[in-house]
Structure formats: C-alpha cells, structure tokens
C-alpha cells in the first residue's frame, strides 16, 4: 500500500501561527531546501511530525466578555462553540442528554468547596456584624437562578442555550427547578445562626409566588419570605431605586439599589451577597461578594458611576481542550462563557444581532482575503511544478464553510444547535451563498488547469442539490462535476469500494472517509492532490495532499 503523504502546510490559522510557519521555511516551503527537492515523497516524509502538530485546534484563548475580541483574534482564536458546549457538559456531569448530574460533577464539587469556606465563617461574621453595626440585623442576600435554584436542565435540555422567556415562565410557574447543589443546607445553616435571609432576583413580580413556592419545595423551608424577597417590578419602579434611564434600570442599578435600601431603610447590614453573575454583585452595599460559577449564560451590566471593583470582572484568558475534557479540571470561571462566545462569533462575522453574517465586510472576510491572497501566490507555480513532474494536479474542497457559507443557517435558523431535517431543507432548496472569496479562487484554479474535486460530509441524497447550489452562486460550469464530487453514503447503503478498513466497519469517521477518498483520487484516479481545503481539521488530517489549507470556523466542531 502506498505511503500516506501527510499534509505539509496549514493556512488560515491565526496570525501568530502563520508567523511561526513563515519563520520555519523547512516546514512552510516544500521546495526551499535543495535536499528537499529530490522527490515530493521524500520532502513530505521529512515533515510528518510538524504537519501533524499544526493540524490541531488551539487550546489557549483570549476573549473579552463583551464580544469585542471578535474584531482582532482571528477565527482560530475564538473558542469553538461546540467545544465550549462539550466542556460545559463535562463540568456539569451532563452525559449528553442536556441534564446535569445532581449528585456528582466538577460543578458540584466547586460549589461545595465555595460553601464550605463560607460556612466556616458564618458565625464569626455574624458576631462581628452585631458588634460593628449596633441596632442592625446581619443579613445575607441571594440571587435566585443558579444561586438558589438550578436552571441547567432548562437552559440546556429545554432551550439549547437559547433563552426563551415563554418557556422560562412555564418552568417558573410549574416550580420545576431543583435547588442549587449544597445551597439549601447552607441557607438553612445561615438562618439558624440568626441571619435575615433576603432574595433579590431578576425574575418578574408575576413570578414571585411561584419562585417562593419552588424554594420552599426544594429544601429552603421558610428561609425566604415575601417581605424579604425582591423581584423586578411591573409598572412604576420603587421610589428607592435610582436609574440613569428611568424606564430601563440595569441589573446593577436594581440590585445595588435594593441592597442600599435594605441597609439604609430596613436596618439590615449585608454581610454577604451571593450570585452567579457579576452583575448580581457589583455596585457595593455588601461586606463580601460570593460569586458562584456559571458558564451557561452571561448577563452583563455596567457598574455604578465611580465604582471600580476590578475583582468583580470575568476572566479573559482560557485554556480549553477541543474534546471538552477541560471541564473535568478547570473551574467554572475558567470555561469560556457561552454567551460571550456567541457575541464574539457575531462580531467576527459582522452579525448585527439578527443571526445573519455580513456578506461584504467583516473580520471573517478580512481573514479570508489574507488566506486567499497567500494561496494565490503559489497557485500557478505549484500547478506548473506538478505538470513538469508528469503529474495531474488537483485541488480538493470541502463544501460547508469552505465553498458554501452556512452561518445564517447555523445561527439564525438553528441557533447553534444542529438540526438535520432543517439542514436538508436548506440543502435541497439551494439556499447557501458562496463562502466569501472562494468563487474567484476556485474558478482561477480551474482556469489554470487544476482538476477540482469536491469532498463533503453531505450525503448522497444531497449531491445534486449541492452541485446546483455551487453553480448557482458562481462556480464556473465544469468546475464541480458529478464525477469529481464525493458525498457520504446514506445509512444502510454500501460504502464505495475504496472505503475499507474503517475502525467502525461501514461507519467511518470523517478523517477515515476523507483521507481514504483522497487516496482514491491519487492512487485509483491518478491525480496528485496539490492542496486540500476545509474548515474542519478532520477535513484535512490523514494525508494524501501536499498542502492542507484550514479555513476559520468557530461555529461548529467536527472531530
């Protein structure tokens, strides 16, 4: 069996990686060194280790919580949203059903650790408050969602990380939420010490009765009572709340203003405030702030004028393995918050907030321009070199987010949750625009003489619609042809003859399917794959291409 030719160039990565490649000509330029010009296969074999190392996702990220990093970090520098979901699932002990473990998980362990530390000082802080604030009653203030009541199952199984206020109200009115792990016992302990227990929640006044009922039902007993439970008002705001925009108070204005009222008018001294959002805690009027972990949503709010509180700010640096395994050992704050990831992705694609990408100008398009410009520099020379060697030069292209652009489907239609039936509608209706810059590039390659192959994870029933979509958006006639366009066989059908030896029998991984098909293009059809192009690393690994060109895509991950 011929030796696999591993990929030897990755393009389209973040600037730092491109700079690394440029600084290492023995890897980045297959014809730079005289000894590497003996044969293509000698050259490729010499670079196996470097090539494989390059064809792996990033694991370190810098991301601001407001999404602004999408303007500067590049596609590979944005945490991939599917990897974020897997990391969150691991952290919460979710086995894939969208429900969190209620008995053991890294999340439960972290919350228990936080509350053990708090429990150790409950009595001493209570006594200190009595001494320092004579005539005032020591109090603890608690947020509700993911502070006292646990919303993971609603957020993930029911909503798939896309908030639905009507569905949320159903869960609230039906009192479906379990207690946040270890929190009910902690609140009962605090009440037994003598603390006044106060709830301040972003839930509406219409949800107060059901929320109190839910809290009592899951173990808080009578710790939370109507006089000491504050919800967002309907109608006129309370007189003790001061807001910059009177008709639209921020979370910090509402919660800090309520804490101020409790201390100034209710004769309480707030020893500690507890919340899962930084905006639950900002604005002062509490001796201590206790942040509970929650990477499943982010509710930002500006701090009050003059308040710095730099310690009450989200993380901006993260380490995350693509397979989700980081959820076993990083803290909740060490997981990229999924709402911040979504905002960063939207910024990167020029999405104004409606789930559609800008088709003319965005950081994503700017990155593709650089990538295509870089590839064009060697497009003709690589073709001529292959012809001089007596080879038939070919290029292999993936479809989704390589030649056809799926952002609007993935985000506006699916909200980052893949739906195979909806995807098939889009495919059969030929709804996809071209991936920016790729039409001219592919057509140029075809005009130079390259044979162009398509190699997609779409299935055989989608082949004709995909070819029609490609033609419709401008890929020149004869560029993508049925004979040179490979789709996956449908379940129950026989794989092509060249697909054999997959670890799962007739069920092949993406890497097995695509690398074996590239081997078929080379060894059975007689072509040399000069370059393979894809938005997923699994499009590219496995060899049988002189160069691997990675397009950026943080919107899904197919390992």
Model-derived regions: residue spans:
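Asp-based phosphoryl-transfer active-site loop
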Residues: 138-151, 199, 393-406, 454
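Active-site neighborhood of HAD-like aspartate-dependent phosphohydrolases
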Residues: 148-182, 388-389, 403-436
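Non-catalytic pre-domain segments flanking phosphatase-related domains
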Residues: 2-142, 306-397
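Structured segments of extracytoplasmic/periplasmic soluble domains
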Residues: 117, 121-128, 151-155, 186-196, ...
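C-terminal cap/substrate-recognition subdomain and adjoining C-terminal extension
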Residues: 37, 43-56, 206-343, 359, ...
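Surface-exposed patches in mature extracellular/periplasmic domains of secreted proteins
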Residues: 125-139, 195-203, 227, 271-273, ...
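Substrate-recognition element of Asp-dependent hydrolases with the DxDx(T/V) motif
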Residues: 146, 183-216, 230-231, 401, ...
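Second-shell loop/turn segments in exported
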Residues: 74, 97-109, 169-177, 198-203, ...
């Amino acid at each position: 069996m011929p030796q696999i030719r591993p990929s030897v160039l990755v393009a389209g990565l973040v600037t730092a990686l491109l700079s690394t490649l440029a600084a290492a000509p023995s890897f980045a330029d297959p014809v730079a060194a005289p000894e590497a010009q003996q044969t293509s296969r000698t050259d490729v074999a010499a670079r196996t280790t470097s090539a494989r190392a390059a064809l792996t996702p990033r694991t370190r990220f810098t991301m601001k919580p407001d999404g602004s990093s999408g303007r500067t970090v590049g596609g590979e520098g944005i945490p991939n949203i599917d990897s974020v979901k897997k990391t969150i699932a691991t952290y919460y002990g979710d086995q894939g059903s969208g429900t969190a473990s209620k008995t053991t998980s890294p999340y439960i362990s972290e919350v228990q650790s936080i509350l053990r530390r708090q429990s150790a000082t409950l009595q001493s802080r209570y006594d200190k408050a009595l001494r320092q604030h004579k005539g005032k009653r020591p109090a603890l203030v608690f947020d509700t969602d993911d502070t006292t009541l646990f919303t993971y199952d609603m957020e993930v199984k029911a909503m798939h990380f896309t908030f639905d206020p009507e569905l949320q109200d159903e869960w609230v009115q039906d009192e479906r939420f379990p207690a946040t792990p270890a929190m009910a016992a902690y609140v009962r302990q605090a009440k037994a010490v003598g603390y006044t227990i106060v709830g301040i929640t972003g839930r509406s006044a219409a949800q107060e009765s059901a929320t109190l009922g839910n809290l009592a039902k899951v173990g808080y007993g009578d710790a939370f009572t109507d006089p000491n439970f504050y919800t967002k008002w309907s109608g006129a705001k309370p007189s003790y709340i001061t807001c910059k925009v009177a008709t639209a108070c921020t979370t910090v204005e509402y919660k800090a203003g309520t804490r101020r009222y409790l201390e100034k008018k209710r004769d309480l001294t707030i020893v500690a405030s507890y919340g899962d959002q930084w905006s639950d805690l900002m604005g002062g009027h509490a001796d201590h702030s206790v942040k509970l972990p929650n990477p499943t949503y982010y509710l930002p709010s500006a701090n009050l004028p003059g308040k710095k509180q730099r310690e009450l700010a989200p993380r901006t640096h993260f380490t995350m393995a693509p397979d989700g395994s980081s959820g076993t050992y990083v803290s909740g704050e060490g997981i990229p918050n999924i709402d911040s990831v979504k905002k960063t992705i939207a910024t990167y694609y020029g999405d104004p907030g409606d789930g559609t990408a800008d088709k003319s100008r965005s950081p994503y398009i700017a990155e593709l321009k650089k990538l295509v410009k870089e590839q064009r520099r060697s497009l003709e020379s690589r073709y001529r070199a292959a012809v001089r060697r007596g080879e038939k030069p070919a290029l292999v292209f993936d479809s989704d987010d390589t030649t056809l652009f799926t952002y609007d489907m993935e985000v506006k239609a699916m909200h980052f949750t893949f739906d195979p039936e909806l995807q098939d509608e889009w495919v059969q209706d030929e709804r996809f625009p071209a991936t920016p810059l790729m039409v001219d590039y592919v057509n140029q390659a075809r005009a130079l003489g390259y044979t162009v192959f398509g190699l997609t994870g779409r299935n055989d029933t989608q082949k004709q619609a995909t070819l029609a979509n490609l033609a419709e958006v401008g890929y020149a006639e004869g560029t993508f042809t049925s004979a040179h366009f490979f789709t996956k066989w449908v379940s129950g059908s026989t794989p092509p003859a060249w697909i054999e030896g997959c670890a799962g029998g007739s069920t092949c991984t993406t890497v097995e399917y695509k690398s074996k098909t590239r081997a078929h293009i080379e060894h059975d059809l007689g072509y040399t794959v000069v370059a393979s192009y894809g938005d997923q690393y699994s499009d590219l690994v496995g060899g049988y291409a002189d160069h691997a060109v990675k397009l950026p895509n943080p919107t899904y991950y197919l390992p």
